[in-house]
Structures are given as C-alpha cells and as structure tokens.
UniProtKB/Swiss-Prot annotation:
Domain KHA: 629-697
Keywords: Glycoprotein, Ion channel, Ion transport, Membrane, Potassium, Potassium channel, Potassium transport, Transmembrane, Transmembrane helix, Transport, Voltage-gated channel
Name of the protein in its database record: Potassium channel KAT2
Organism, as annotated: Arabidopsis thaliana
Glycosylation sites: N158
Protein function: Highly selective inward-rectifying potassium channel. This voltage-dependent channel could mediate long-term potassium influx into guard cells leading to stomatal opening. Assuming opened or closed conformations in response to the voltage difference across the membrane, the channel is activated by hyperpolarization. The channel activity is enhanced upon external acidification.
Amino acid sequence: MSISCTRNFFKRFCVEEYNMDTFKHSSFLSADLLPSLGARINQSTKLRKHIISPFDPRFRGWEMWLVILVIYSAWICPFEFAFITYKKDALFIIDNIVNGFFAIDIILTFFVAYLDSHSYLLVDKPKKIAIRYLSTWFAFDVCSTAPFQSLSLLFKYNGSEIGFRVLSMLRLWRLRRVSSLFARLEKDIRFNYFWTRCTKLISVTLFAVHCAGCFAYLIADQYHDPTKTWIGAVYPNFKETSVWSRYVTALYWSITTLTTTGYGDLHAENPREMLFFVFFMLFNLGFTSYLIGNMTNLVVHWTSRTRNFRDTVRAASEFASRNQLPPNIQDQMLSHICLKFKTEGLKQQEALNGLPKAIRSSIANYLFFPIVQNVYLFHGVSRNFLFQLVSDIDAEYFPPREDVILQNEAPTDLYILVSGAVDFTVYVGEEDQVQGKAVVGDAFGEIGVLCYTPQPFTVRTTELSQILRISKKSLMSAMRAHVEDGRVIMNNLFMKLRGQQSIAIDDPNSEPESLLKEWLVGGSKTGEGNASDQGHGHKYLQLHDSENIDMGSTEWRDSRRSGYGETKRVREHTIEIEEGEKPNKEFDGKGCSDADLTSFEFHSQEAYPYCRSNIQIKQHEAAKPKDKRVTIHLKSRDKDLSKLIILPASIEELLRLAGEKFGYSFTKVTNAENAEIDDEDVIRDGDHLYILINENS
C-alpha cells in the first residue's frame, strides 16, 4: 500500500492534472493550453516527427530528474566555491556526470515544442523552436553546463584559482527550473497550496543561509591574516579543523544574522568583512519582509473564515439585543450561523453557481435523484420529471430546535428530509402541540404548496437535519411540462391525506383532478402565467372540466350558499382571478364597484381541510365557459320533433327555451334511458334530451 501511494505521489509531478486517467502519451489537455478566441480548440494531437510535447509524461519525468540534480547543484556550488579545492576525486566525477545530463537537456530542447504566448497553441516547427531557444536561454544554459573545473586543469594554475571557482558558480542558473516547478505546483489542484508555499519559502530561506555562510567563510579564508577574521578571532587555527566544523560554524553565523538574533560571539574583524556584513544585513531587511509578508498572507487567509464567523456572530448578537428578541429566536439565529460555518465546506454553493448548468444538473442528479425518487409524493412519476426537478434543488442544514416552516406562512417551498427529524406542531392557545413527526425520506410543506393554502403546521427540527428544498416555482414548471406526472403527484397527495387521521376526508369519492387543474397556473393554451411571473396584478386559473359542464350566473350566487357541492362546479371552469402576488392573499377590491365584484369562498374543507382560499372574482371579466350543444326532443304520444340548441345555465331555463321552440309547456327532462334529469351538471356536450309535455297545457 505504501509503495503504491508513493508511486502515485511522484506520478503527480510527471502527469498533468487533467491527464491522470485519460491519456498516456502526447496529451494536450493542459492547464497551460488555452486557445485564443475564434481559434480551433481541437488542435491535432499528433506533432511532427521527432518533436516532443512539453506535456508528455516522459518529458515531465525527465524535468523532475533535472530538478533533483538542480537541488544538488544549488548546494554543492557555494560549498565547493568556499570550502573545497578542485581535485580528481569522487566529487569531481559526480559534478561532470551532472553536467552531462544538463548537456543532454540542451540538445533535447531543440526538439521540444513550445507554447506560443499569443495563440496559446503548441509550435512544433523545428526552425522556430531553434530560433526561439538560441535567442533566449541557450547561452546561459551552455555557460552553466561548461565543465570549468576540468578546463582549469589544462592551465598551469591549479584548479583552486578563484577565477574558475567563480565561473563554476554559473551553475546556479539552473535554479530557474526549481522556480518553474513551484510555479506549476502552486496552480496544480492536486497539491495543497498552503504547504506548497511553505515548502518554497523554507527552501529559499535555507538556500540564503547556505550561500551567506559559504561567502562569509570564503572572505575569511582569503584574508591575509587569519586571526583578524570573524572566525579566526574565535578559532585561530580554523583552517586546520575539519570541513564539517567550519561549515557548521559558518551556518551558525549566517542564521543568527539572518534572524537578527546576533549573539555577538561572531562578528566582523576587518573592513572587507564589515562591508560584506553590511550588504548581507541590507539583504536581510528585504528578505525578512518577503518572508513575513508571505507567511502573514497565508495565515490570514487560513483564518479568514473563522474571523468572518466571529464577526457575524457578534453582529447577530448585537442585533438581537438591540431589538430585544425573545431568547428562543436568539438561539435559533446563533445556531443557524454556527451550523452554516460548520457546513460551509459541504455546500460550496458559490462554487457550484459558477459552474455551467449542465455540470450543476449532473451533480444534483447524482446526489439527490435517489432521495427524491423514494419520496411518496413522486412515486410513479417519470424519470424526466425527476431529472428536471432535482436540477433546481438546494440542500440546507438546520440545527436542532430551528423552525423550518411557520404555521400560516405563505407556501413557497417543498422540503424533503434527508437526515435528522422534525416535528409538526400547531399553536393552540399559548403553547405548541405536536401533531406529528417526519423521519428520513419524508416530505413536508406539500399541502401548502399544492393546495394554495397557508402552511397548516409549524415544522421544527428536533436534531441536526439535512433538508432538500424545492421551490414552488420549480415544481410548478415541472408539473406544467409533465401534466401526467402532475396528476400522479396530486393522486399521491390525495391518498396521503385520506390515510392521515389528523386530516380526515368526509367525501371518499372526491377526486384530486380539480386541485391539479387549479394548481396549474397559466396553462399551455393561454399566456396568463407570464403575467403573474412578471408582477402584474392578475392571476389566471385555467380549470378545464372533463365533462364540460356549463355554468350560469345563477350558480355563482348558489355556490355561496350550497358549500362544497356547488363550489366544486365553480372551480371546474375557466375563471379570471384578480388578486395580489400571493395566492392566499385577499383582493382588496380597489378600483372596482360593488356591482362588478362577486365575492365567494372555496369551502373545500370537507375534502381537503387545509385547501381553502378566499378569492374575489371580477364577474364581468370572467371568461366564458365552453358552450354545450345538446339535442332536445319533443316526447309525446303523437309527435316526435327535435332541435339542436346551446344548453342554458339551468333546467328551468332549458324548459323555458324548449317551450319557446315547440310552443308547449314542459315540466320534465329525461335522457334516452327515460331517467329524469334535475341537475344540469350531469348533462354532457352532445347529449340527447327528451322534454315531457305538461298534459294539462
């Protein structure tokens, strides 16, 4: 397991972050590749022959090997410059092998494609690659790779001459590879940014300490009087001590000076050292500012969430105290803020909002589809309906004893409990009475949303709960787009209400069809739904009766007296409702005369005790229902006449109209089976009606 983890860790350095599981070779999906506007983004992935992609994992591995050699060079160059004379020993052989690797890299660079800074496309023409390299870093790479230590042996002076030792310091040019590596790792999402920055700052600090110590020792070593140096004043025979002891002493002086500790035991003894120490301390001023600034930025960024959280808590506490809010509301406010802070990393709503809708829909479908599918309200609906619905779902966390829904609150959302538990309470007198409980997988708030009624319960959490919220607008759009699924939802709600003892249904033959038709605001045949969405003062209910029952003005008056039976007929027709923004808000009637307004009340408590609405209708603007055509027959012993007419609003009007057509006085209406009809609601379009003559006329 440890070997596999180590292999995967080092693989991150060699493979681009977007190519880990997709392409093995010559992959171009890189964070550095960004085609310009209008350019082709599907650039061919096949380069010219003998041209290497800079994003090839094998080339990335080669670069990582060179970075390791650069780290070695960064340490050995100042160390050899100050402490070691050039000799044909093992260190001499290692240095030349390292130089050989960098010489190979110089040749290899002529065959590596580069990223054009203007088009952000790879350039694989050998001529352009060569011109670009020769005009930029070629000379510096050659100077940093030249074996000056070996060349010094060809001259009469030995390899310890200061001139060749200075030229060997050109190998520090290779450090640009380390800088490029850190710049790439800081943008790589697979590596922690904080620890990447800390590693970079620590590396820079150690390199500065190492170089300063080596340079300080070199000045003391080259001074004509060893006892008049910063190290000779303490160790007169320091040149006779081991290299390790001298190197540790130099590091000790360097770190105490860099950290401005300055114990005073090691200090400058001659003007040459004093001048170097002055410049080194000036360098320390800028370098310390760089370190402190970067570390402060990292720490502040790390603790900014906590600081913002404490500021929010303090502001909420001051607001509650200033407005003298009750203790229970204060507790809910603080609990909600604390829970939001703890679950901020789980939601990341801002990050999701920045993604394209297709990606957000895929995430929501993966997270919420199985949960919504098991809710009783959506049993039997199509997958397309659920997919459209889950795309607009929001997940929220609620602490214990927090109100999710308030009793008599305007219905705005439907909730699904994912984890935790909630209680349904009703405020009676001066105390709350628990009417029920919801467990994981239950939905609540559906009665208010689907029945256009204020919420019948207060829903309060009893423990830490995760709840999915579906807005009324999203549910409305989905049900309009899938009418059959909307009918299934209403049937599921109806069966749930019939099965609950606390929500009794007196009429078992009632159907939820009329509720569905009332809920579908602004149907497909009309554009009235847009008026409501745009803030206009009208709301239209498209209520289509499956039996096309006619309704006259007399029934509007009768509906106010006869309760549910007549109200059902009223609701099953197309009407125009003048009201405010909220469905359960009464229209104030301003601007209309008393003669224009007919007020009535939907009393559907017998079937749905929580589905009620007080709405005022502007009668003269009410849409006319579809007229029913019926055939009336004169039924007598010696005559059989028939006429096709428009069905009037009542049986009395029908008998009067038949009397005008046939010239007789009629008393009864029957159908083809000789069954007497005393209610016009049972008459359908196209029926044949038989009129009985009053024998006394």
